[in-house]
């Protein structure tokens, strides 16, 4: 469906307003300065192994857990001053736990197979998004009024990974209250992209994306209600998976979902190597993971593949960058050449309304009729009530405790209608039905992860609706795997979303494994020259 003349005019007008506002914003926004333009290269070969490879070596006594954990601690201490990804560590406790693992392995009489079955991640280090409860660690989500809060227990997903033998190294940064695609807050500061320190890492799981992309962690935990796993994975060149809704327990993270949001929020794995996705999801899902048949072999040659290059031209969203369109076309060519399949290119008109659909559904009341907690109410947690307009005035004077993105979201909510548009609801239902019928149990769809390659810090303020490329799949409840596709001409990560039908997670995960081999997967940023 082509854009109308009026819609094209609105698009040009919006872009003009955005750049005028951006010029004004630069006068007020804090400026960053870095004396170093790139990460130091990885020198310890243990940091270049997947979690599954590390677990195997630890079980076989080819390397100790202490050696692996210490290698990651050394790397974090080397690069974290540059990227500001980890906000609180537990290095001493992690080394003690690693020593206990090594002792357990020495004393185990049942053999390697027993350990693999019982403790598949035994001795492997992991990092955790600060929004999740990790015993003894902060759980503030960047809110100053929660700065002294320490978790007394683990979130269920964290507990399952620890029970499988994983050793947490610490917690990582996120956007204020987990509702923005730049990981920045006034408690911990801003997190930098490992490929270019002047670029964003995405959000809200941006600290995880950055620390993984920097080679300072091998596996991590993120959450996703609008792209908060997939966007950071895209910007930082790593893998991530938003599972089918209802598979992984979402409890133990802040802020809690309300209204209908629990049906859109997903907890999932983030990692540098695709082979770690299925084992992590199997562990994190607990008994629910059985619904996914994750270990059933997938024959990619028998799947139906589709490619959607853009959302149809919404005037609210940036056009997809040519390098991203080209990367997706290269995936299509490779699939057709290697697998002998025919990838069908589609345009789906309803995707044009992705942001409106996401916004409408996120604001919808729950089954009990209660509306979701407003963002301003969440910002007021543990302190005085936040008045968005007054907070904006304070921000311009430099006195606000909140980020501009958080204040802006609270302001937008003031003008949000409590009555959903019948037209938007019709588009949502139509899109849901069309995609579910299209994908079925053997379909895979390629879709841009984001219309833009990682932007400079603070720039997303002026393209706030671009996240709708990921957010729409939260509303639809479909599983999506984020897959890296090499680097752009500027040395920044490229990527694509791989979408499958409900409970068909294994199809998108199998496709990601194939694309990792075809396109090289994660690229070490320390070996990438950054343009000034």
Swiss-Prot record:
The chain crosses the membrane at residues 9-29. One of its GO terms (molecular function) is fatty acid amide hydrolase activity. The keyword Oxidoreductase does not apply. It is an enzyme of class 3 (hydrolase). It is a single-pass membrane protein. Keywords: Hydrolase, Lipid degradation, Lipid metabolism, Membrane, Transmembrane, Transmembrane helix. Its EC number is 3.5.1.99. InterPro entries: Amidase_CS, Amidase_dom, AS_sf, FAAH2. The keyword Transmembrane helix applies. One of its GO terms (cellular component) is membrane. Gene3D superfamilies: Amidase signature (AS) domain. It holds the Pfam family Amidase. It catalyses: N-(5Z,8Z,11Z,14Z-eicosatetraenoyl)-ethanolamine + H2O = ethanolamine + (5Z,8Z,11Z,14Z)-eicosatetraenoate; (9Z)-octadecenamide + H2O = (9Z)-octadecenoate + NH4(+). The active site is at residues 129, 204, 228. One of its GO terms (biological process) is lipid catabolic process. It is found in: Membrane. Belongs to the amidase family. This is Fatty-acid amide hydrolase 2-A.
